Amino acid sequence: MAPTPDRDGQDKKVCLGVVTGAHGVRGLVRVKPYTEMPEGVAAYGPVETKDGATSFAISLKGMAKDLVICKLEGVDDRDVAAALRGTELYVPRERLPRASGDEEGWYYADLIGLRAVGLDGRDYGRIAGVENFGAGDLLEIAPAEGGQTVLMGFTDENVPEVDIAGGRVVIDPPAGTFGDDAEAERGE
């Protein structure tokens, strides 16, 4: 399958995790995985930085709580490993298997840039990200009229339809999510 161009015309990449710091003195790194199974961080071949400027062969070395300990090729001492803190690790979308659990087979990364449309057709804006700060998945929506992004729970009730082919996510936001009373019609 050919990669799908993103908004900037670049091939789509999926972030598998982020380096949280060094582990030991031999250049190992701690990685917070964004994959379903933590070891998935090292399962899809070499990883690269978001801009694609640096690529690393990656191997799994162990686990530490909710983090994965990895070896990145070319990172051989603690100082270099520590300097990578905050670096997100990506792979091209086409390296990943078809997403399971949904007949369309999509990943959260596929939602970025899609229109967020209400049940009534109202244009709420575009999906800017999918976040999880520990209490569940959240859609980050950049409002159509501009301003700060809005976070909304990514639940079946709030997001009744994801239409990748149509370039949209149908949302039913809770009252007050977008700072107006239009959502109050939901009857809650």
Swiss-Prot record:
Subunit structure: Binds ribosomal protein uS19.
Gene Ontology annotations of biological process type: ribosomal small subunit biogenesis; rRNA processing
UniProt keyword annotation of S-adenosyl-L-methionine present: no
Free-text note regarding domains: The PRC barrel domain binds ribosomal protein uS19.
Record function comment: An accessory protein needed during the final step in the assembly of 30S ribosomal subunit, possibly for assembly of the head region. Essential for efficient processing of 16S rRNA. May be needed both before and after RbfA during the maturation of 16S rRNA. It has affinity for free ribosomal 30S subunits but not for 70S ribosomes.
Record's subcellular location: Cytoplasm
Main location: cytoplasm
PANTHER family in UniProt: RIBOSOME MATURATION FACTOR RIMM
Protein name according to UniProt: Ribosome maturation factor RimM
Keyword set, alphabetical order: Chaperone, Cytoplasm, Ribosome biogenesis, rRNA processing
GO cellular component: cytoplasm; ribosome
Family: Belongs to the RimM family.
Pfam assignment, any one: RimM
Gene Ontology MF, one: ribosome binding
Segments forming domain PRC barrel: 103-177
Coiled-coil stretches: none
